Amino acid sequence: MIKMAVKFVVVMIVFAQILAPIAEAAQGKAVYYDPPYTRSACYGTQRETLVVGVKNNLWQNGRACGRRYRVRCIGATYNFDRACTGRTVDVKVVDFCREPCNGDLNLSRDAFRVIANTDAGNIRVVYTPI
């Protein structure tokens, strides 16, 4: 009986670890901005290129600075064939996207290109904290 209980607990822990990232994933829209990626709200001048600015709901009065997200394109916001590349990109929050911000995530052009065709301009994404 104890052996079965231990197996059950182990199985539950494994499922929790597998499903936790899925539960934290959010969907939203992403746009991009062109370089130079300087004068960011978090770090001033910085050299990283896989970066993102976030909207107010993610910004949390600057507490978002330094957070990392894994972002995946799931489709174009507008009718645009083959917007997504099928890849993911890991980005670091370095900026605040002030209203009117056209996306939940304002990706650097370099980051956007990893996951989507820049001609799409505005895409639907899934993003997960990492």
Curated annotation (Swiss-Prot):
Keyword Chaperone in the entry? The reply is no
Q: Using the record's annotation, list all stretches that form the Expansin-like EG45 domain.
A: 28-130
Q: Extract the Pfam families matched here.
A: DPBB_1
The positions making up the signal sequence are: 1-25
Where in the body, by tissue, does this protein show up?
Expressed in unstressed leaves.
Q: Which UniProt keywords apply?
A: Glycoprotein, Secreted, Signal
Glycan attachment sites: 106
GO term, biological process aspect, one: systemic acquired resistance
Task: Name the InterPro entries for this protein.
Answer: EGC1/2 (IPR044206), Expansin/allergen_DPBB_dom (IPR007112), RlpA-like_DPBB (IPR009009), RlpA-like_sf (IPR036908)
In terms of superkingdom, the source organism counts as Eukaryota
Q: Which GO terms describe its cellular component?
A: apoplast
Subcellular location as annotated: Secreted
Is this entry keyworded Glycoprotein? yes
One GO term in the molecular function aspect is:
peptide hormone receptor binding
As for what it does, the entry says: Plays a systemic role in water and solute homeostasis.
Q: What is this protein called?
A: EG45-like domain containing protein 2
Species name: Arabidopsis thaliana
Gene expressing this chain: EGC2
